[in-house]
Amino acid sequence: MKSASIPIYLQQAIMNTLRQKLQQANLYLNRDFPEPTINYRQRGTTAGSAYIKNWEIRLNPVLLIENQQAFIDEVVPHELAHLLVYRYFGKVPPHGKQWRWMMEEVLNVPANRTHKFKIDSVRSQTFTYYCNCQQHELTLRRHNKILRGESHYICQKCGEKLIAKSIDSLNPNLYPMDFKMHRGGKGVNPREHR
């Protein structure tokens, strides 16, 4: 990840939104939730994360600088809602009805589960794998786990194990790599199985 220095005006805007939304929630819910810590150490393509045990919100500095207003308006309330939901309802699904209610009714922000930011600047090297129905791009970390025989991944759509294949027509001696690992698991995206 590229390192990014967050300008003071942007840090202040983040804190202003955080404090305003927290005050809004405290008034609506008749509570006195403490102010979470904000740090700028989120990595990869994730815009932000809420750490419940630390009462902390981590923001991706590169994506923040590239998408300033969207972070202020959407990402900060999104992550704050996760913290508030946990304190108010206990352990519930991360983007379930309680989270949607907190976003829309309490914080007055659309309950979008994912961001739509361009991620070219934070995208890491990927490796192409295939199943019976589509192509998948796996991260270097997942690719290396497969090579070491520690994991394999299953397509959630067709249920088949992902296999690295060479589509290099210049080298007909390259065959699909198939690792001798058992099949298993289900999910929506390619998932790790041990």
Swiss-Prot record:
> Mitochondrion: present as a keyword of the record?
no
Entry's localization field: Cytoplasm
Tell me which domain of life the UniProt entry assigns to the organism this sequence originates from: Bacteria
Annotated disulfide bonds: none
Q: Name one GO cellular component term.
A: cytoplasm
Quote the PROSITE patterns the UniProt record gives: ZINC_PROTEASE
The cross-references to InterPro entries, in alphabetical order and at most eight, read: SprT-like_domain, SprT_Zn_ribbon, Uncharacterised_SprT
Gene Ontology MF term list: zinc ion binding
What keywords would UniProt list here? Cytoplasm, Metal-binding, Zinc
Write down what this protein is called: Protein SprT
